[in-house]
Amino acid sequence: MLALAGAQTAGAATVGPAAEQAQEQAERAAGTARSGDVIATYKGKKINLTANGWGTAGNCTEFPDLTVQCFDREDEEKAATASYKKAKKGTKDAIADAPAGRSDLTAQSATAGAMAVQVDGDGSGCTPYGAVRLWEHTWYYGRQLTFYSDGSKNLGDYTFRDQTSSICNNDESGGAALYDWRTGMPDPQIITGWVGCLGNLHSYSYPYGGDWGDKADELTM
């Protein structure tokens, strides 16, 4: 669940932009459960996403227990997620079953200025219940990165910094915010509403000029 940092309260002391930025980043970082390099399992071997990137993988998922698995295809990811759900059911690291009225989230087929999804695999905007999913390219194409655990994610740790061009939020509750880290000023954010997608971040204006495509340094959910 996203909790927005830096909310103003009555009587709060006035701070400069740099101090405000540092305070907000510290508050968000307090929600980070992971430390150190991100080590993933891919084709039965360990790979260091932080130091060495994805290799030939096209799809990586961080599960609630913070383990990361990478895959070549989306059907492999779906099978691994089903196995994880079965193994972790009833534990603190379980993936919750969707309640009545909720399910996997699927965006609609591509039209100008709208969300888009084409087919399963590349171009799919399907996002499992309880997850937030990022894509490398617009309209849900390219490498995809999925998160189930709430908190702040330094996308550089996953070799995904400045690489997000579309996002879907199907978390259990709350929004999902992408942040761009700035020096000496508050970090801009763009929020994806609960049970929603932004299929083309290049179409959203960025506060300091340009657009939001390939700008995100951090995800908070």
Residue ranges and their predicted role:
Residues 1-5:
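Bacterial N-terminal signal peptides
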Residues 6, 13-221:
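Compact beta-sheet-dominated domain cores in extracellular/mature segments
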